Amino acid sequence: DDLLANRVGTVIGAFGNTLSQLLFGTNDVSTDVTFWCATTNQPEYVQAYVDDPRITQKLDPSKPIAFLTHGWTDNVNRTWVKQTVADYVRLIGGNICAVDWSPLALVEYNLAARNTPKVGRYLGKFVQFLLTKGFSINQVTLVGHSMGAHISGIAGAYLGGQVPSVIGLDPAGPAFTKPIPVSTDRRLDRTDGRFVQAIHTDKNIIGTTMNLGHQDYYANSGASPQPGCEFPLVNNDTTKAYLQFICSHFKAVEYFRASLDRQNIFEGTACSSYYSYKRNDCSAGTKDDFGLFNK
């Protein structure tokens, strides 16, 4: 489900949507960006809106709320999104909303990247609405994968950098940090929240080697192939490399899902490089945990 190699229809759809946006522009952002929420008592998606008169019936203002934002060509009905929402409700509880911006994401890559600022601002507007309905900014978490990491950062900046936790899952590199970094108002950076984390799992291709948060975790050096993404039975080198970096890009999601269970500890060590880490030569030696349970 998560390998783009299996998404031929997605590529065709992206081509058609790109032509449509270039010729006719986009719809109102409230049409193109939607919020699909679940709670401990209501684990199935319920759509919520800015200025929703029934919002306190759909969500519990007394409980924490997290927002999960997908990346390029994705949507909230992907298996990984639904599994993450289900795990969050089961293991953490409270409220979680999946942010669907698929009409703006299912287009040519650079066009999708240019769409991210307005998506992030609209997410920020939705959070602002929730704050008027009894939610506390101190209970908000923003999580995003790939381009969704930058959307989460933009939303955090829109909210004045006051969100306690912003987490980027293998934040996208191309068009954001490479070939040259864009301005911080268009990407994730450490000023977007009170504590910003990023985990890197495919830093050299889809992701980035640039540190974006207060803490950046480079899982297994942060590069492809991640464990389980080797594809040893694939003989064609080009196909193998492609499958490896796509699989590795989505490993960040798997690591985040696993980290929702307190029994799984994803401990990182502050170090100047992965080479130094492998040599046990980390002068600071500071250790901390990735995810919501960061100390």
Positions of predicted regions on the chain:
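Flexible "cap/lid" loop of the alpha/beta hydrolase fold
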Residues: 175-189
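Active-site nucleophile loop of the alpha/beta-hydrolase fold
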Residues: 167-176, 200-204, 222
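Glycine-rich nucleophile elbow surrounding the catalytic serine of serine-hydrolase chemistry
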Residues: 70, 143-154
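Flexible, membrane-associating and regulatory peripheral segments of lipid-active enzymes
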Residues: 1-98, 104-115, 124-137, 161-165, ...
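Short beta-strand/loop motif that positions the catalytic acidic residue
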Residues: 68, 196-199
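Alpha/beta-hydrolase fold nucleophile elbow
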Residues: 134-146
